[in-house]
Design a protein with these regions (language model features):
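Loop-helix junctions at membrane interfaces
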Residues: 1-206
Length: 206
């Protein structure tokens, strides 16, 4: 395969991953019900794109993930959408520039870090399954940990007020979200990334 052909194929793959992210973000396909919790799966195409296409493509897909989050939280907001959109306000609380940081930075990193984790693990582990699963878990936790902690840093009191908690209970509520949403999401991401990633690596090349 010559360089031009590979570049064209990579662009097609990137467009497919981008399309999947958009569809998942706008439909229930981006969420898996786990009892009382809905696990977000939109970051999984970002992780897979990073592993298959490289960190630059992963960063672009992560940026798209952030953009879809911004659009959804602006057009169909929830009580805490001000943490993701500077164009939404709740009572006297408005989103601002930090909302964009929360919306984009963690998601872009989700598209960068798995590429390097996978390459590093492949030097130690011959099988693809474990490195893929680890990348899925780590990529998902990067998103959850960064988003929730940045919310606490920049919007802690406002977020707590919207959730009906205050004072020391705010960070406990943050930790509760990480435990009840973040960990199940990471497990789901690990399983799907390993299963789908093995097929894509086999038929789509590395």
């Amino acid at each position: 395969m010559n360089h031009a052909t590979k570049k064209t194929q990579d662009m097609v793959k990137l467009a497919l991953f981008a399309g999947i992210i958009v569809v998942m973000s706008m439909t229930p396909l981006g969420y898996i019900p786990l009892g009382a919790v809905k696990a977000t799966t939109i970051h999984i195409p970002v992780i897979l794109g990073s592993i298959l296409l490289g960190w630059k493509a992963g960063a672009a897909l992560g940026g798209l993930f952030g953009l879809t989050s911004l659009i959804v939280n602006t057009l169909t907001p929830s009580l805490t959408s001000f943490t993701f959109s500077p164009f939404y306000s709740l009572g006297g609380v408005s989103g601002n520039g930090w909302s964009l940081v929360i919306c984009f930075v963690p998601r872009i990193l989700v598209g960068i870090i798995p590429y390097f984790v996978f390459r590093g693990l492949k030097k130690l582990i011959k099988s693809d399954t474990v490195p893929l699963a680890v990348c899925g878990f780590i990529g998902s936790m990067i998103n959850t940990l960064l988003v929730m902690n940045l919310i606490y840093v920049f919007f802690g009191e406002s977020w707590g007020s919207a959730r009906g908690v205050a004072g020391d209970l705010i960070y406990k509520a943050i930790l509760a979200v990480i435990a009840t949403n973040g960990i199940p999401e990471a497990i789901v991401a690990a399983l799907i990334t390993a299963a789908v990633g093995k097929v894509l690596l086999k038929f789509g090349g590395r």
